[in-house]
Amino acid sequence: MIIKEKIEMKSLKRERDIIIYVPDDYLTSKKRYPVLFINDGQNAFFDEEAYIGKSWGFLESIKKLQIDVILVAIYCNFEPLKREDEYGPWVMSQDLSQEFQSNRLVGGEGKAYVHFLTTELKPYIDQRFPTKIDDYGIVGSSMGALISFYAFLRYPTIIKKCAILSSAFWIYEQEFVNLLKVTAISHNMLYMDVGGQEDDERYVSSNEHIKKCVEGKLKDFQYRYFPEGKHSEYHWSQRVPIFLRMFYGGK
């Protein structure tokens, strides 16, 4: 079952479109389901709504793997540079902000965004659906991966699974290194990958650096390098079954 609606983001004083997928028999199955938040949720399910006309194909993947999970896809902010603001945990330097062709400093709303996810959206989902309240995960790519990883590190007792694809770590590399030093995630699960044909060589170098910082901090950690992987929804969609199987099993 697919449910589309708008939800108020009190933490950011705006509204946002979300799409919720729940198993068709959720009212009668007497099951409780894990939940996966999907950033850039407009790309999660439908090609006609996705960037460049290619979705990540989550519905096809969970059906093929026979996974029972609730998916909550949160659309990004489509206003100029607001996606970068919301998915940016810290304010970027002037030089980095200029790379986004901005005459102002970019980022810094990420803390409020993950506060919305954990203290507004999660209780809303838990109240409406039969969830496993202690089994939440999050996924994102590029800057959506940054905010996913930030949520995973800031709220490790709430967000216990995280998949980050082609993370733009070069934007906040040292900030994440510092945050990793003071965060306990040993009992959580992390999937991380990067492609060899990303838009900028800094993707690979920064992901390799963060990988080294992560290693040893948690047992359930998987890092993959795809030599032919590009920075696109098509390539990310090919990797969805990998982290879904890691998190939830399936065929």
Describe the predicted segments one by one.
Residues M1-K251:
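Non-catalytic cap/lid and distal C-terminal segments of serine-dependent acyl enzymes
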